[in-house]
Amino acid sequence: MSPRKYVIVTGGVLSSVGKGLTTASLALLLSSRGYSVEAIKIDPYINVDAGTMNPYMHGEVFVTEDGGETDLDIGHYERFLGKNLSRKHNITTGQIYFSVISKERSGDYLGQTVQVIPHITDEIKSRIKEVGDVSGADVVIVEIGGTVGDIEGLPFLEAARQMRLEEGFDNTFFIHVALSPYLPTTGEQKTKPVQHSIQELRRIGIQPDAVVVRSHQPLEQEGLRKIALYATLPMENVINSYDIENIYRLPLLLEKQGLARLVERRLFGRETRPDLSRWEEFVALYEKASRRVKVAMVGKYTKLRDSYISIVEALKHASAYEGVRPELLWVESTDIERGVVDVDRVFEEADGAIVLPGFGVRGVEGKIEAIRRFREGKKPMLGICFGMQLSVVEYARNVLGLKEAHTTEVNPETPHPVVDLLPEQRGIDKLGGTMRLGARPVRIVEGTILWSLYGRELASERHRHRYEVNPTYVDRLVEAGLVVSAWSQEGYVEAVELRPRDHPFFLATQFHPEFKSRPLNPAPVFKGFVTAVARLRG
């Protein structure tokens, strides 16, 4: 059995430069060559996980099957690889220090002076190797978040440097992703920041084996030659990843430039042809779609689109197979409350709406008003998580006539708590990792819209919530025409909808269908929504 291979992806110049998509693309390219691949994201922040972080600071919290609240890049990895990952695929500084300090308190270090080297770096390497050992992967790709030079990332870069020594040159491959900025005033693409970034990486003791240069537009050969010379690399080891409209074309761009071939040749001593036929078919379908549909995205974190990135991607997946291109109308629900945005105008412009997840008081009434308008106006509407809970609140107020109905999350004193805290959440006072999280079985009611989308009674979907539809009010809601189309094993409401005779498509789910959507296997809920929107558009 050949030794396990490790690919380490680092970044330079600035964060959010494209390391995550580069990692996901390489994972796909190696997987398409028949290798088993795992992808890990390292986040150097001291938080234990992303669960308590503001979406404006960090973007979406991606929930894994086992209930991990992880970085959004884990979502990219899952979508490109087409496989489920776990909480162990997202390593943070908080996890590492928590583990090392716990071991020290337990006496595991036998009186040693606990230091960054070797104790912290050993823990980092152990976490990386554990993912490979558990899965038996041929290749483990590790993306180190942040940029070279960040003080928070130094222990992780040191651990990566040690891995080259311990695992061997032929079993490790370092890729550095750095930005070559474009200056519109002079029309120049500058390579100096990339050169300085490589220099900083070398100071730490890491020589990159390939450099992926991010740029606004394709770089001239002279610029790539400069970078290759400075990095002490052949020209073929400098890859240009320029801006493209469709992220799902990126693996094809990197394949054309030979990135996976470089990695495979070094680590496995051979070159094989990938099978990208199904991926290419999806890309062609997505890019061929010309009929546009307008979808209102009603939420409270709309100023940072990464807050809802899995929902955006799930829409793309479903739309490609329907032959339409979604045009997203971002609607800040707080602006509806303030009167800055006219909900009637949103309704007239959009072909359908998604009421997005979120927590807390801000923007709630704006979401409820949007739900009312799309329900009464009979345009397709999909509510997710908090969007489902507020759909129930809206229905209770405007159909049942319970004008003061609310969720106790927003109004603990409401006389009609149609949404209330889950029984299992009572008495919990810590926020981190304590919600109802991860994949849970969902029992779908036959004869409903949801059943027509899944075609079966049992499904597994991911969750992230503390509140439920209050069972005390379920019978009254059903008598008033609301359909409960799915239940949990514990008896919680998992989905509500309206009958097709009452509304062309009104569906809201407690679970998050977006987390399991894949380019080659779109989520049924999003397929149903997009089909309804496309039908309305004509």
Swiss-Prot record:
It is an enzyme of class 6 (ligase). Mg(2+) binds at D73, E143. Keywords: ATP-binding, Glutamine amidotransferase, Ligase, Magnesium, Metal-binding, Nucleotide-binding, Pyrimidine biosynthesis. Gene3D superfamilies: 3.40.50.880, P-loop containing nucleotide triphosphate hydrolases. GO terms for molecular function: ATP binding; CTP synthase activity; glutaminase activity; identical protein binding; metal ion binding. ATP binds at S16, V17, G18, K19, G20, L21, D73. Disulfide bonds: none annotated. L-glutamine binds at Y56, G358, F386, G387, M388, Q389, E409, R466. Allosterically activated by GTP, when glutamine is the substrate; GTP has no effect on the reaction when ammonia is the substrate. The allosteric effector GTP functions by stabilizing the protein conformation that binds the tetrahedral intermediate(s) formed during glutamine hydrolysis. Inhibited by the product CTP, via allosteric rather than competitive inhibition. Catalyzes the ATP-dependent amination of UTP to CTP with either L-glutamine or ammonia as the source of nitrogen. Regulates intracellular CTP levels through interactions with the four ribonucleotide triphosphates. InterPro entries: Class_I_gatase-like, CTP_synthase, CTP_synthase_N, GATASE, GATase1_CTP_Synthase, P-loop_NTPase. This is CTP synthase. CTP binds at S15, D150, I151, E152, K190, T191, K192, P193, V194, Q195, K226. It comes from Aeropyrum pernix (strain ATCC 700893 / DSM 11879 / JCM 9820 / NBRC 100138 / K1). The active site is at C385, H512, E514. Belongs to the CTP synthase family. The lineage of its organism: Archaea, Thermoproteota, Thermoprotei, Desulfurococcales, Desulfurococcaceae. Its EC number is 6.3.4.2. The gene is pyrG. CTPSs have evolved a hybrid strategy for distinguishing between UTP and CTP. The overlapping regions of the product feedback inhibitory and substrate sites recognize a common feature in both compounds, the triphosphate moiety. To differentiate isosteric substrate and product pyrimidine rings, an additional pocket far from the expected kinase/ligase catalytic site, specifically recognizes the cytosine and ribose portions of the product inhibitor. GO terms for biological process: 'de novo' CTP biosynthetic process; pyrimidine nucleobase biosynthetic process. It catalyses: UTP + L-glutamine + ATP + H2O = CTP + L-glutamate + ADP + phosphate + 2 H(+); L-glutamine + H2O = L-glutamate + NH4(+); UTP + NH4(+) + ATP = CTP + ADP + phosphate + 2 H(+). Residues 294-538 form the Glutamine amidotransferase type-1 domain. NCBIfam families: PRK05380.1, PyrG. UTP binds at S15, K190, T191, K192, P193, V194, Q195, K226. It holds the Pfam family GATase. Residues 1-269 are annotated as: Amidoligase domain. It comes from the Archaea.
